[in-house]
Amino acid sequence: MKVLFIAGFGPIATDVEQSRRLYEEALGITFKKEDGDYRHTEELKGANTFAVWPLEQAAESCFGGAEWPDDVVRPQAWLEFDVDDVAEATREMEERGYKLLVSNRTEPWGQVVSRLVSPEGLLVGLTMTPWMRPGEHDVGA
């Protein structure tokens, strides 16, 4: 597996309003708001994307419902690595014994993703993010 870049990172919020006050009001970060309370920016130098991802939306992405299962460590943050080949990266992680929550799924917005919870409690994605790869088509799909 070859990691190409960090596609994005940020907190997973259980109290979106408190997170909004910290990041928008106190730190002055301007976010775009989409899909309910999902807030993101591609304008912070040094990051492709920084986003506050509501836990309910992370649960929907991983499990198909708004509730995070009690038997899976609840993540505090998310981190996505764009890789050269998501299918191969997924296979490698499974061979190493990692339990994937999502395998090789294409999200409604076009990103291909496999996800797992890291030992530190991060929701880690192995991704192919088309809009971050100008000139490339169907990479990792």
Predicted features along the sequence, with ranges:
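A short local loop/turn or secondary-structure capping micro-motif enriched for an aromatic residue
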Residues: 57-61, 132-135
